[in-house]
């Protein structure tokens, strides 16, 4: 080690040995007054913030932890986003692919330079977990759906539950284009401990068949000292809560043993390479979180191959790149509000493997569509959602997620040729029983017959176990209703020996039965010779929610000669591809 580095090491150890306390998180009181204002104050729908010359950044206001970890940064007009690679770690090893500059969080803002290929280890010490409370989230509404929000408020108040609303998301501009992904959350009014919130969730599921999520509010951010060691296992610096690493030439980093698939049967570790910069931060448990700060285009290069077959037709890959770009922008400021990053690299947000997961074909598609997104005829950024297999007919957004109808997300037959003799979803049994539907997702060379049409059988014992939390006893009846134009259901009535209840929501229905392929399905009771219930048979079509672009159908359309703007115009009701930077 050079004398200069040794001297800097000594200065860092002295300067960072006594860490400064973390700054208190910013607060904004937009809603009803509270005795204790949380880190993320709730906002009443329709109430504007008071005029002030010191209003916080809309993406970072009220968020816990180091505030600039949550900022949407820009370089040359392109957004850069902080993506979680892994968290809950005690130690992480990494190497720069080019010359590296390290910045230590804490007093003095110390820096260190290191050569390409050097190996470094970050270890968390003196970690303290965040203290947080939670409110049960009862519903989510599009920003335009004030009527739906008001109706839900009255419903819950009539049930005896005090509620409040919170405005989530943000309005921000990119190269003159306005991106607005605001929405309303309807929350239980009382801030609860995690255990009490989980108990309230169970009660709501039992009484109303409603599966809820938790809205977390940080009362005290997590903190820790991050210890940096070189390849000789020598401590060269300490950082309070955060350590930044970047390669000025943009060559990026190799990270050892990246954890992925947490909670799934494919949970494992893999050495991976990433473009962009790295941030080592403290997660909510007081452990180490590794965050990749990467430009949106480079993010898509490592993301798109996980969303679609890299061997698919180039026009389908371009369509996927455009929709994925819009989906990422739509999630900014919506997820991971209590974490030191905006998005994660798992199924919860989008699977992202960095440079390791890139493919030449999908990289070419990202580069060919650089900065392009979908805009509706009235100039709005389209919520460019997609699912794997529509089953021959896409679905309306309001059937799947509630809220007002979105003109860009209208369900329609996804047929490549006229088929006047083929029954439609209005005759669902016949539609699902028809094998010769000329659907784009059936005619695609990547067609998945067992997803296009499928059956799922459950024994009576399995159904009773799956519905036990509903409190209806032994199940005697299952009825799917409130269907959309594709036949997808958004209401399930479950009756049993101890009563009946309803499960509302396309995703909630699918989750109840261990993630059914879709809710475009019929359900029939199966009985033995004596008429006793023995099980239940679901017959269905499609894989996923069915709103927006059918990914397998997009491949079929590309193979039939359609360009990516034509494909997107079809699935998003006339939407146009336009550059945002």
Whereabouts are the PLM-identified features?
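Conserved, single-site charged/polar hotspot
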Residues: 7-581
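Positively charged n-region of N-terminal signal peptides that target proteins for export
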Residues: 1-5
């Amino acid at each position: 080690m050079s004398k200069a580095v040794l001297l800097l090491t000594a200065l860092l150890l002295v300067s960072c040995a006594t860490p400064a306390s973390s700054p208190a998180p910013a607060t904004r009181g937009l809603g009803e007054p509270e005795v204790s204002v949380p880190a993320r104050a709730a906002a009443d729908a329709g109430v504007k913030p008071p005029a002030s010359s010191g209003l916080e950044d809309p993406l970072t206001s009220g968020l816990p932890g180091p505030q600039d970890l949550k900022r949407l940064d820009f370089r040359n007009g392109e957004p850069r986003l902080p993506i979680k690679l892994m968290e809950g770690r005690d130690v992480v090893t990494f190497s720069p692919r080019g010359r590296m500059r390290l910045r230590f969080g804490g007093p003095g803002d110390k820096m260190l330079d290191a050569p390409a290929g050097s190996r470094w280890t970050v270890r968390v010490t003196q970690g303290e977990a965040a203290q947080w409370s939670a409110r049960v989230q009862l519903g989510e509404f599009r920003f335009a759906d004030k009527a739906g929000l008001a109706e839900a408020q009255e419903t819950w108040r009539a049930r005896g539950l005090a509620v409040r609303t919170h405005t989530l998301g943000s309005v921000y501009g990119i190269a003159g284009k306005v991106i607005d992904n605001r929405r309303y959350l309807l929350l239980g009014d009382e801030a609860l401990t995690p255990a009490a919130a989980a108990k309230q969730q169970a009660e709501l599921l039992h009484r109303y068949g409603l599966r809820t999520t938790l809205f977390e509010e940080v009362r005290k951010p997590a903190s820790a000292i991050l210890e940096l060691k070189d390849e000789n296992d020598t401590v060269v610096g300490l950082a309070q809560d955060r350590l930044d690493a970047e390669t000025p030439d943009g060559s990026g980093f190799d990270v050892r043993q990246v954890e992925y698939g947490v909670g799934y049967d494919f949970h494992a570790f893999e050495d991976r390479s990433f473009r962009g910069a790295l941030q080592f931060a403290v997660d909510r448990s007081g452990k180490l979180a590794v965050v990749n700060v990467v430009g949106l285009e480079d993010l898509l290069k490592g993301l798109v191959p996980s969303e679609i077959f890299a061997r698919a037709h180039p026009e389908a890959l371009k369509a996927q790149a455009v929709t994925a770009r819009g989906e990422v922008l739509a999630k900014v400021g919506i997820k991971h509000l209590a974490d030191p990053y905006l998005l994660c690299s798992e199924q919860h947000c989008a699977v992202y493997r960095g440079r390791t997961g890139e493919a030449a074909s999908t990289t070419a598609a990202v580069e060919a569509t650089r900065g392009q997104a979908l805009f509706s005829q009235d100039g709005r950024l389209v919520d460019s959602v997609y699912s794997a297999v529509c089953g021959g007919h896409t679905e309306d957004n309001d059937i799947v997620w509630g809220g007002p109808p979105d003109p860009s997300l209208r369900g329609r037959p996804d047929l490549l040729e006229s088929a006047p003799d083929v029954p439609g979803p209005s005759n669902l049994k016949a539609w699902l029983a028809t094998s010769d539907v000329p659907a784009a997702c059936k005619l695609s060379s990547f067609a998945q017959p067992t997803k296009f049409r499928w059956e799922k059988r459950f024994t009576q014992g399995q159904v009773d176990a799956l519905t036990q939390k509903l409190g209806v006893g032994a199940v005697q009846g299952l009825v799917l209703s409130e269907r959309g134009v594709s036949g997808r259901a958004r209401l399930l009535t479950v009756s049993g020996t101890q009563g009946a209840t309803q499960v509302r929501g396309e995703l909630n229905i699918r989750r109840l039965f261990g993630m059914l392929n879709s809710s475009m399905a019929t359900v029939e009771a199966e009985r033995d010779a004596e008429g006793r219930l023995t099980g239940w048979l679901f017959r269905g079509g499609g894989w996923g929610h069915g709103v927006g672009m059918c990914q397998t159908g997009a491949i079929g359309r590309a193979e039939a000669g359609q360009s990516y703007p034509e494909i997107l115009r079809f699935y998003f009701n006339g939407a146009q591809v336009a550059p945002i930077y």
